[in-house]
Amino acid sequence: MITEPRLLLTVGEPAGIGPDICLQLAFHALPSGVLLIGDLHCLRSRALTLGLSLRLEPWLEGNPWPALERGVLHVLDVPLAQPCRPGRLDMANAPAVLATLDKAMHLLRAGAADALVTAPVHKGIINDAGIPFTGHTEYLAAACGSPKVVMLLAGRGLRVALATTHLPLAQVAAAVTQEGLEGTLRILHRALREDFALSEPRILVAGLNPHAGEGGHLGHEEQDVIAPVIAALQGESLRISGPWPADTLFTPRLLEDADAVLAMYHDQGLPVLKYHAFGEAVNITLGLPIVRTSVDHGTALDIAGTGRAEGGSLLRALDNAAEIVRNRRAAGC
């Protein structure tokens, strides 16, 4: 019987630092067995470019799960259409990048793996290839048939979830609705209990407008949308407070008594999180039937293949994925 979490790791955009940070794993203590999904030739070529001495072993579906072995990584080969060069995007390879996610979903559905960790992809080149793509979060939600998911970034004791994700700022206010906000808070509360083993999680909710609307003088979303949802959930004994002015919420006095923050939009919450824990933070998708974590950074094309990429966030993403699998098992999920 397999007891240790079985982790899948998609390599991401092959021209970026995804291959670099994945290869670094061969020299680190990992939380459990990891299977890479990507182009085997690309990984071998990048290892040569970086001067890394390791073994890359092909893995076929149906094989025993890879054992932990220092200096060895196992790869489920998903070939690229064109050879990969560090730092140079190629639209022809965009379908293969998405194929790694599809292959991972196949293994998860089959019960052959327990969690998915993703290295960064390049949204622009995928869209340039004629494939509509907003991001990992939305792609995996569609693949899982999950009507609503929540993006959470966590690092150095701070957890920040988002009420809206990849939207132009001009569209945010209209996207913050009572129904959507209630769903987001319920997903966040459940994840804090089941994935992070917090029995009574405490959540701080940010306002949308400066000064949380200043009593309606700087916007009505706090009074009309956010506060009623908070009050309703408080009536169910959930430990949720707000709406707080965002510049007040992100201060030590309030954060020390909180398990998570809900920000209304991407650039309200994530700049603080990344300033606090960049390179150590983990992106976690809540509301999926699978466990999915990712790094807190992008493809960094400018340093791909140079040896300057740091894999700290990826190591923490693997640790977090394994921890969530264990916590869900303990909770009977």
From Swiss-Prot:
- Position of the signal peptide: none
Q: What GO CC terms are in its UniProt record?
A: cytoplasm
The pathway this protein participates in, as annotated, is:
Cofactor biosynthesis; pyridoxine 5'-phosphate biosynthesis; pyridoxine 5'-phosphate from D-erythrose 4-phosphate: step 4/5
Under the heading InterPro entries, the entry gives: PdxA, PdxA_fam
Assigned keywords, A-Z? Cobalt, Cytoplasm, Magnesium, Metal-binding, NAD, NADP, Oxidoreductase, Pyridoxine biosynthesis, Zinc
Which residues does a divalent metal cation bind? 166, 211, 266
Main site of residence? cytoplasm
EC id: 1.1.1.262
One example of the protein's molecular function in GO is: NAD binding
The answer to whether keyword Glycoprotein applies is: no
> What is one Gene Ontology biological process annotated in the Swiss-Prot or TrEMBL record?
pyridoxine biosynthetic process
| Reactions that this protein is recorded to catalyse | 4-(phosphooxy)-L-threonine + NAD(+) = 3-amino-2-oxopropyl phosphate + CO2 + NADH
Which major enzyme category is it?
oxidoreductase
Q: Which Pfam families match?
A: PdxA
- Subcellular localization(s) per the UniProt record: Cytoplasm
Keyword Zinc-finger in record: no
Which SUPFAM superfamilies does the entry mention? Isocitrate/Isopropylmalate dehydrogenase-like
Cofactor requirements of the protein = Zn(2+); Mg(2+); Co(2+)
Cofactor note text: Binds 1 divalent metal cation per subunit. Can use ions such as Zn(2+), Mg(2+) or Co(2+).
Task performed by this protein: Catalyzes the NAD(P)-dependent oxidation of 4-(phosphooxy)-L-threonine (HTP) into 2-amino-3-oxo-4-(phosphooxy)butyric acid which spontaneously decarboxylates to form 3-amino-2-oxopropyl phosphate (AHAP).
Q: How does it assemble?
A: Homodimer.
Recorded hits in NCBIfam families, A to Z, give: pdxA
- List other remarks: The active site is located at the dimer interface.
Official protein name in the record: 4-hydroxythreonine-4-phosphate dehydrogenase
From which source organism is this entry?
Acidithiobacillus ferrooxidans (strain ATCC 23270 / DSM 14882 / CIP 104768 / NCIMB 8455)
